[in-house]
């Protein structure tokens, strides 16, 4: 899961998709309460201005073929964390108890027969407030070489108000 990812090829082939870069870096590697990752996403044209910054905590799921990805928001001014993925020890100064859990936004991933991890948020559980949205949905498929992520937001009537309407963003791993 850690590494640098880009959907540049997808964006070139289909103008409906913005070109996005995603960085995932391990943080707090000495902790024993799961694998912690700092995740930063930026438009390729504005790499120094990420539009999404999160912390993921990956813990064991209900069985040997599942994990739960707990999603957290960072506290305070997000600009102070921009580019943290470049550091040897990202977010070292931040303590996990300062993170803000995104209630209802956890993703349970299950390992399928093809060795892909597949999962999604629970329907109507992840609250959202931007673009007139009431809730958001995320679907994820991960392999060793790519992450497919389909984030969509809906208003209180169930009409989609943001996110791709045609399918997931396909991020290809560009480096570790």
Predicted regions, residues:
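Short, solvent-exposed loop/hinge segments that bridge or flank secondary-structure elements
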Residues: 4-32
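N-terminal glycine/threonine-rich, aromatic-flanked beta-hairpin/loop signature
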Residues: 22-50
């Amino acid at each position: 899961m850690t590494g640098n990812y880009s959907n540049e090829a997808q964006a070139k082939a289909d103008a409906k998709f913005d070109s996005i870069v995603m960085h995932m870096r391990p943080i707090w590697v000495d902790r024993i309460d799961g694998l912690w990752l700092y995740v930063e996403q930026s438009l390729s044209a504005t790499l120094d201005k990420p539009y999404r910054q999160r912390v993921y905590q990956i813990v064991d799921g209900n069985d040997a073929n599942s994990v739960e990805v707990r999603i957290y928001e960072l506290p305070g001014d997000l600009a102070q964390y921009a580019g943290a993925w470049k550091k040897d020890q990202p977010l070292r100064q931040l303590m996990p108890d300062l993170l803000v859990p995104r209630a209802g936004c956890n993703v349970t991933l299950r390992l399928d027969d093809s060795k892909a991890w597949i999962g999604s948020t629970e329907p109507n559980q992840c609250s959202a407030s931007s673009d007139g949205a009431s809730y958001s949905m995320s679907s994820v498929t991960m392999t060793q070489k790519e992450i497919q992520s389909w984030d969509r937001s809906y208003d209180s009537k169930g009409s989609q108000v943001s996110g791709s309407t045609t399918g997931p963003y396909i991020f290809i791993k560009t480096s570790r």
